[in-house]
Amino acid sequence: MIGSEGTLGIITEIVVGLAVRPETPATIIATFPHIKSAAAAAAALLKFKPSMLEIIDQTTLKAVESWHPLGFEIAGSVLLMQLDEDQDRADEVLKLCESFEMIDGAASTDAADAVEFIRVRKLAYPALERLGATLLDDVAVPISKIAELVERVEALSTKYDLTIGIFGHAGDGNMHPTIVHDHGDLKAQERAIAAFGEIVEIAQSLGGTASGEHGIGSIKQGFAAAELSPAVIELQRAIKKAFDPKGILNPGKKLP
């Protein structure tokens, strides 16, 4: 059922198991001169088993700074990390980041500091949204390909004359390209849709996927078909028919 996007059934009851919330997680923020160094650092930081590992590109940072100045004027990228365990290793994390050209960094187990550190990530989408209409979705790539994805999307931004910011979950390569275009400008909207399609194709060419967490729905069915073999598609359709012979569960979604 997981990942079927409502095409195989409905949930009538959920049993939730809650983990104990860590008392004093360590929150770490680090700035880098460019996305390459930040992405390389993110890959190296996985050994610390972070509960959060977020990355923000320069375009998004500029949008945030123009709205709520937070001191990221010279940063090319920002990493945010949280350690629920081994909080005392925060200094070790910052030391490792230094080997990846870190400009500046800080760590704290104080809750108020954590809120302030994470603020830039909370403002990422709203900051881009205030610039115009947005087309936001997600793609996922191997962590080692995050920098290349961002650099190729920057080229698309120039090609289509659009602002495209990227932020997302560096811990699993799930990125959120956010395309900004003028409200009411139909030609700009068409360019945004074309850019969106190319972003998905870039992700797929890098060994990634059309969707990391937002799902396929109806918008990405064609891209999903490009990733799956005919045999896999037929198997999925057979499973759908077995669970939903009348085709009444979220019809027309997910399946290519």
Short names for language-model regions:
Residues 1-256:
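Noncatalytic alpha-helical scaffold of FAD-dependent oxidoreductases
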